[in-house]
């Protein structure tokens, strides 16, 4: 089920992307980080996603009079897994070349947890918090937000 294009949401996406990019750019003036609120961009993405998913569900309920959990989750998988697999396959050769063997073991585990949409738990319980200084050695650390989003949709589609 295709939702109508909403150009105003692109403006919100732009704000979200820029806040995350500026945060990760670590731009400083006289030693002071000028943008400390990158997390706001992630929050904006969560809100946009919740809004769009709710719109899709309501539209399906209005048109068909019912809602299929199976179809909902099939659409989520078809939308997310191909891009996630592409990123993983693209990253593998670089990780093989640049990561130390001990780091590569954690990298391999992070792939499995990312595919299971539970990387937020993996990174948290393995002491690899998002925002940690060694984040550059964790190519899939960013998948914590995807995991949180998908866990939310398991509980509250």
Language-model-derived ranges and their functions:
Residues 1-157:
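Membrane-interface helix/loop caps of multi-pass membrane proteins
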């Amino acid at each position: 089920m295709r939702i109508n294009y909403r150009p105003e949401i692109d403006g919100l996406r732009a704000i979200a992307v820029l806040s995350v990019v500026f945060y990760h750019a670590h731009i400083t003036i006289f030693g002071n980080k000028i943008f400390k609120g990158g997390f706001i961009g992630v929050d904006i993405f969560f809100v946009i996603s919740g809004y769009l998913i709710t719109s899709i569900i309501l539209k399906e309920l209005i048109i068909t009079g019912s809602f299929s959990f199976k179809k909902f989750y099939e659409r989520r998988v078809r939308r997310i897994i191909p891009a996630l697999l592409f990123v993983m396959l693209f990253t593998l050769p670089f990780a093989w070349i640049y990561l130390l063997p001990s780091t590569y073991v954690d990298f391999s585990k992070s792939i499995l947890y990312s595919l299971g949409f539970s990387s937020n738990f993996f990174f948290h319980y393995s002491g690899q918090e998002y925002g940690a200084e060694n984040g550059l050695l964790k190519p899939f650390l960013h998948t914590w937000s995807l995991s949180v989003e998908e866990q939310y949709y398991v509980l509250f589609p």
